[in-house]
Amino acid sequence: QGRGYTVKEYKKEYNKSNHDEYEKPPIYNFEMHVELYHKIYDTFNEKYADVKQRLIPDAEVPYRLHFTPEDFYVFVIAHAYKHYSSSGTGIRTLADIHIMNQKLGGTMNWEYVDSELRGLGIFSYERESRELAQKLFGIAELPTKANLSETEQQMLAYYLGASTYGTIENLTLNKMRKLQPDGGAITVHTKRKYLLSRIFPGREWCKAYAPTVYKYPVLLPFFWVWRLAVKGVKRRDIAKQELEAIKRER
């Protein structure tokens, strides 16, 4: 606070997540993490739970630690995929991937990188994003439908439509798709299941977002009532966007 920072407006609280967000006009925004991934991201959380063991000492500043280029690249891809697979992430992510490959691609141990990406289940995502980024930023001419495959066109449209921090529609649809067992069109049953999970979140959800309720599960029914009465009013605009996304999906 002495440096002019305040807790991000929409939270008005801290120590309630895996990171605290601080803002300072006109543009500064810092996220101070206590852990790199929520526990709901099982694979990523397990990988980076003890991140210090993956860091190496800096050659110039003895008290500073950092990733190797390979581990840095893998972490950035994992972080990008976390957003991509939930609410989405903007085209800036493709620019980041392209620049990293320009600067680091020629010296990285790709056998190690690919092994790490496969272990995290994001090998295909990295390859497809890297190839798309190369077509967008690696040539002087603007890309056309002629040199983008149908899959690449769809992927680009998803990136372009995600704004900077993703959209509620993407988040809602991606969550419903994860609930759809056969990977097909989202059914009425899946929509109902999703709505129930949003109105009555389970104990595992509370582990990340309501730790006190997770610790004392007897509070869960009271939490549901409070969530509907308080959050339902405060965040009614978001709830409306979710409902509209559910209705549009056929």
Which role does the model predict for each range below?
Residues 2-250:
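Conserved NTP-donor binding/palm subdomain of two-metal-ion nucleotidyltransferases/polymerases, i.e.
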